[in-house]
Amino acid sequence: MDSDTNRRANEPARRAAKGVLRWTCLIVLLLQGLTPNCFSFAAEPLPPTHVDDFIGRPRVIIMSDIGNEPDDQMSFVRLLLYSNEFEIEGIVATTSTWQKSAVHPETMHALIEAYGKVRSNLLLHAKGWPTAEELDGRVFTGQPGYGLAAIGADKMSAGAEAIIRAVDRDDARPLWICIWGGANTLAQALLHVRATRTAGEADRFVGKMRVYSITDQDDTGPWIRREFPNLFYIVQPSTQKGDDYYYATWTGISGDVYYRNGAGADSTIVTNEWLDANIRSKGPMGKLYPRFAFIMEGDTPSFLGLIDNGLNAYRRPDWGGWGGRYIYRQPYGETHAIWTQGGNTFSRVTSQDTVAGVDGREYTSDQATIWRWREAYQNDFAARMDWTVKDYSHANHNPLVEVNGQAGTAPLLIDAEVGKQLLLDASQSRDPDGQGLHYHWFHYGEAGSTDANLASVTISGADTAKATVTATGVCRPQWLPRGQCLGNGTAHIILAVTDDGSPRLTSYRRVILTVHSGSTR
């Protein structure tokens, strides 16, 4: 037997032995309270300028500690009414710091049963709704215990296996893991893959995932980020106690009153009274939408930015959208950069947006990156709830936006030269219900802030179908003087098109300008 044949023959035994050694190392170090360092990964994380340019609906797995308080159930109702926007490949019932020894898949099944009663009506308004049976078959139980103590070599759960199957699927699209509770089911899946595959195979596995976690609700989130540094991870790191939740971007979904961090936001459309009138009063799904105990739908931002509304925020977290805006940096206590909050105030590269509030004054905060879109995402939800009980002619539907002859929702990429005018024409946009349309173009000045240069632009005709954009500088001014501005700049122009229906619905298009001076082109 030659050496190559012998090596191939011994490969299964070699890999099995390697797996045993890895698990042994893991167990010993965990028992000693130490962070395992017996697994190393050489692959680099995706660069912060990477754009997920895939075709098709986003693939998602939801991990929820549903049952501990009402907001998970609220978010789950909204998720089901947008289930035609995603490919939901798994729904995992998990534990968390608020629910350490129980999981509640039965609540998920009950909500899916109600969805099944309205699916035929939803099909009158849009295509792509999964059947209730399909969704029921994708509900899994995650790790039954809390945090790191519940993971290990012999602790695989159905939820962890579902994550592995979904990642391994032959599909070029990344898999979004939306974490509403604890992260230990994801940790178990990662541990199993790392112990049973080569380093290169495990790297490729990790590279297929995109994680958006609603803070850290057990002790595995920080552990995952230390052990798998090339994993794409959106999170504002936090303690497990929740005493710093008020700082997190996701609270911008509705947390203004409870967390006292939403000055400028319109809190009237996230009250129980508004929800009674616009959500709970409508059909089987509305009846299962509970009153909130603390805030409305704290977990919803994890998937809200994946909705195909024209903002395309899921392609790069610093572009900003309904799920918030994040930048790539290394927070205190983390071992490497992640997608998170904070930034450099002096260079004006931060995760905060400056937005006009309901009183007309400007407010700057991380939460504003979500609440700036609140009227649109709440009206959109109310319209979806109408779809569950009304026929097409008595419900409202989103405008269809066309810019410079390009229909669809993909961003437009255009070169622009400083000092030269650029016409953006959306006059061919239309409303499927025949209603009037209102246009608003604006420069999203903070979007794309990972890029070296954020350009300056002006917009004339901002409230008409045809706007004229003029780039005034490759680099915008900073609070501190700096040297010469080199290279090209970037500017994101957002078009919001709103109809006259009830509720009024908004669709968007994003135009990304690469700005250069005539001398550098």
Language model: regions and residue ranges:
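N-terminal acidic, glycine/proline-rich low-complexity segments
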Residues: 41-423, 429-455
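Bacterial N-terminal signal peptides
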Residues: 23-37
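N-terminal secretory signal peptides that target proteins for export/translocation
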Residues: 1-19
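Short, solvent-exposed loop/turn segments at the edges of extracellular beta-sandwich modules
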Residues: 498-504
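Extracellular interdomain linker/stem segments of modular secreted and single-pass surface proteins
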Residues: 514-521
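Extracellular and select intracellular beta-sandwich modules with Ser/Thr-enriched
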Residues: 504-511
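Surface-exposed, flexible coil segments in extracellular/virion-facing regions
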Residues: 443-480
